[in-house]
Structures are given as structure tokens and as C-alpha cells.
């Protein structure tokens, strides 16, 4: 944050931070405009009846999700311009990887920006999505793995995928996942990508191998 304030630009700030840390690769913000994630959460009221309430802010949305299920997500402002650097990176990429991460607060927000969504649909890069290991977290209660793809398609109907990586043990609805992936133009690569110590966490090495194999086959 100090570098951003000193240089007056988040892209320059992140580049300086990367140089200081001698980091490989580059982190780019999708917009120079501060964005707020908001959403609708369906939960039971004091009388037991279901109601939908609007929540603003990523932390508030995550907390509210403990009490119900996220049914919609949005960005404010909705017309924030994307950074040219991010759009150029998408255009020039060989592969674009989506996930893993919280569906509504980590994966979908990028697709809510029209310019980014259009760039992802238009790029000549191949597209890969890593499905989450768990489907029953607070954000996605009641959603199966196939539903994650269905939600993604509902927000970005023009987005095509080439490969979906799914954990061989975590996914129980294989046929449904394959059907949803096929609707987006993708094949499913089933692989053991969870940690041997904690099956709810991705193993970095296993996931790296699975991604490498998906990209080379």
C-alpha cells in the first residue's frame, strides 16, 4: 500500500514490490478504481422464513454466508474500467487459469467486469479451470461441483474452457461435471490434487503436476 501511495499507481506499486522481492511473474490489478464486492444472501429470518438481504464488502459477504447461501454477486462501480496491462496480459497469454478459490468472492468478480469478461472470451489463449475441493463451504452451500461450472457459465455465457481439473476423490458427480464442462467446450482431467495430510487443501506439487500435464496433452 505504501508503494502504491508513493508511486500513485497500483500497477507501478506492484511491479516495484515484485522487483524488491525478486519475484517471478507479475501481479496485475484488474482495475485502478477501488472495487467493492456485494451480493445477495438467502437465509432464514427470526421467524424461520427465508429472506434475501443485500450485503456489501468481501468480508461482510463471507461472514453473512455463514448464515445463508450466496445467490448473486456484483461489483460496485459496475462500469469500472479494466487496466490495459491486465487486458494485454490476457490477450498475450498462452494459458489462462481460473481457480481454485472461493467461487463468489475470488473467481467470479473478475468476470463481472465487462472488459475482462470480453478479453477472456476473445483471447487465443487456452483456458483452464481448477475446481475447488470442497463444495460445502459457506459461500456455496448446496452447490455440487457441477453447479460451480453452471454458475460460472451463467455469469459468463460466452466464456469457453479447454480443460477442467477435478480432484479424483473430491468429485462424486463425475458425469454431471463432465456434462457441464462439455457445455463450455472443455474436457475434464481427473487427478489426485488434494493434500495427503488434509484432503480439503490442494497439494501445491500435485496441482502443479496436474496443470503441467493438462497444458502439455
What are these regions (language model features)?
Residues 47-93, 110-114, 122, 193-217:
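N-terminal glycine-/serine-/threonine-rich phosphate-binding loop
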Residues 97-99, 128-130, 165:
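Structural motif
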Amino acid at each position: 500500500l505504501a508503494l502504491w501511495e508513493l508511486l500513485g499507481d497500483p500497477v507501478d506499486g506492484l511491479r516495484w514490490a515484485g522487483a524488491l522481492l525478486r519475484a517471478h511473474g507479475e501481479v496485475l490489478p484488474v482495475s485502478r478504481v477501488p472495487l467493492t464486492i456485494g451480493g445477495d444472501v438467502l437465509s432464514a429470518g427470526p421467524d424461520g422464513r427465508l429472506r434475501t438481504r443485500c450485503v456489501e464488502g468481501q468480508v461482510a459477504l463471507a461472514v453473512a454466508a455463514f448464515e445463508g447461501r450466496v445467490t448473486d454477486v456484483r461489483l460496485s462501480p459496475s462500469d469500472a474500467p479494466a487496466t490495459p496491462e491486465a487486458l494485454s496480459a490476457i490477450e498475450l497469454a498462452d494459458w489462462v487459469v481460473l481457480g481454485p478459490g472461493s467461487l463468489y468472492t475470488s473467481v467470479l468478480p473478475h468476470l463481472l467486469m465487462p472488459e475482462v469478461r470480453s478479453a477472456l472470451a476473445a483471447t487465443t489463449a487456452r483456458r483452464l479451470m481448477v475446481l475447488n475441493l470442497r463444495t460445502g463451504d459457506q459461500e456455496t452451500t448446496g452447490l455440487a461441483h457441477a453447479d460451480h461450472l453452471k454458475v460460472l457459465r451463467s455469469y459468463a455465457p460466452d466464456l469457453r474452457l479447454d480443460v477442467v481439473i477435478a480432484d479424483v476423490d473430491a468429485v462424486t458427480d463425475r458425469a454431471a461435471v463432465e456434462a457441464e464442462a462439455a457445455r463450455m467446450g472443455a474436457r475434464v482431467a481427473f487427478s489426485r490434487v488434494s493434500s495427503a495430510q488434509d484432503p480439503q487443501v490442494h497439494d501445491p506439487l500435485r496441482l502443479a503436476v496436474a496443470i503441467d500435464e493438462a497444458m502439455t496433452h
